[in-house]
Amino acid sequence: LPDIRGSLGATFEEGSWITTAYLVAEIIVIPLTGWLVSAFSMRRVLIVGTTGFLLFSVACSLAPTIGAMIAARALQGAFGGVLIPLSFQLIATELPLSRRPLGMALFAVANNVAQAAGPSIGGWLTDVYSWRWIFYLQIPPGLALLAAIARSIRPQAVHAAGLRNGDWGGIATMALGLSAMQIVLEEGGRRDWFASPFIVQTSILAATSL
C-alpha cells in the first residue's frame, strides 16, 4: 500500500480505501451469490464473476489516480465476491462424496498458502518491477479457472422469475448495513473508534439497516 499511495499521490486515509472498498463490495455480494446462482446458474455466475474480476484487476493495474484505483477495487471485490461461496459449492456438488473431504482440505491448504505467500510475492514484485504487477499476477490463474469452468460445468437454463420475485428492499438495506459494518471494522482503528463522529454515525447506520 505505501508504494501504491506514493505512486498515485494519495494520503494515508485515501490509501486505506484501496482495501476497504474491495472488502465492502465483497461482503455485499457474498450473501447474494445463492440467489444469483438460482436465477442464472452456477456456470454463468462463475464465468461473469471471474471475467469481471480479471478485467478490474487489469483496471487496478492501470489506474492513474487514487479515485480510479478505489473504484476498480470496489468492482473487483464485487465480481470476486461470488468466487468464495461458489468454491465450496463446487466441491459439494461436483465431487463424489468420498472425495469431498480431500477437496475441502486442498482448498484450505491452497487458501492458506496463498495468504501466507501473497505478501512476500507482492513485496518482491513491487521491489523488482512495480506494484502494478501484483494485479497482473492474478490474470494467468484467472484464465485457467475460466477454461476449467467452461470445460467442466454444464450449462443450465436461466430462471429470470427469481429476479422479479427478489426482495429488493431487503437486498438494499442488507447491502447498506453490511457495507456500513465493514467500513466501521476497517476504519475504526484508524479513526480512534467511537471518538470519531464518522464511526458513530456509520455504526448507527449499520445497526438500523441490519
Feature-to-residue mapping (PLM):
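Hydrophobic transmembrane-helix bundles of small-molecule transporters
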Residues: D127-L210
